[in-house]
């Protein structure tokens, strides 16, 4: 009582006050560090990949399940999924590959039939185990579409591109036909994953792995030619920037592609089918039997409307590109050349 009346504090109270003051100072000093730590975590590759996966999964889930049928009014997806089930049944019964007898009066008769999406159909088999085939097909299509876009996003994060989530939004929102085709239940989405894997191997210069990758690509989809083209462009980039011929990427990719055609249940008929595809689809106007609309060009205004965002990005890339000898510029040069090739292909054939 005497201490209170005299205006002094007990020793314990003074010590507590001093300790509290020290704690406040320490907390104030630690706050910026905690904020910096949180920012570092949010910008870490793991956090960026998780955020991107959630965004991609949500967008494609909404698109795929916004309709009761397989998106998007395309009948090919039903064929692909049903054939995957027939492959599984053939494996179980020892009749592999099974006989395809749905179109006996065409080049797809049982004798000449070739499954040029063979590995893609094998990868679809687990989704045929659903009691409701349509649900299984939609989930499988959703997963492959997600993997396609996520692989592109992963490459952005891997290469430490600034603001990868912004670029992801640009990828998802740049073209309605792109979203349309990713939701069609075809092998295109798988081909994007394999292409990104190939580009990553170019960048890391792990060329030997290109052989098994090309082998898998040739078994999965006949657009393996895109990987061959990318390998050729990378060889050119190295020749241009380093003044030396780096032959390994192109040789490994070509060798793997040939092996994928030879070590194939449909060999040698798959070579004949490849030739027929090249002839009829590269010159569709010379045949009375037309091919699918995806092999015809857009009109000019359709092309500009569908690819406006991508074309704007291409223009900015052309203007800002700096041709130097650095490794980063080599990578940028490859992507610039390859995207230009795809743009020109899309001008001629809308499927690209």
Over which residues does each language-model region extend?
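Membrane-interface coil-to-helix junctions
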Residues: 59, 63, 68-145, 176
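Transmembrane-helix motifs of polytopic, lipid-linked glycan transferases
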Residues: 139-160
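Membrane-interface transmembrane helices that cradle and orient dolichyl/undecaprenyl
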Residues: 195-209, 310-328
